[in-house]
Amino acid sequence: MNLPPYQPAPRTWIAKFRDAFRGIYIGVRAQSSFVVHLITAAVVVGLAAYLRVDVIRWSLLLLCIALVLAAELFNSAIEWLAKAIDHAENEHLRNALDVASGAVLVTSIGAAIVGGLIFLERLTTT
């Protein structure tokens, strides 16, 4: 039996943004690690303001923060999908979850290195 392809109803930009903010809200409430990343981001922003880093370094720091938070949201989305698919032990789902967690770790380490280099350079030249 051939079914026509699924065609979602057109949505307004307001609805799309509402759903996106809902997703961020769910990510913050559902994941304690997301809150840790937000606290770390606040510390980084405060330290960058205190050290008066230049606009290029601000851009790098904010990009790193955004990448880590986005990776955490993707990880959360994969976790929600895995729970919806199967509650039993499943090697493929476990691998997907581990890879997603690895992506968060890689972005977090990269962000820490970038932040460390920026702050170390600023602290040693001030």
Stretch-by-stretch model annotation:
Residues 1-77, 85, 89-91, 101-126:
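Hydrophobic alpha-helical transmembrane segments
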Residues 82:
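Active-site-proximal acidic segments at structured loop/helix or strand boundaries
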Residues 96:
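Short basic (Lys/Arg) and small-residue
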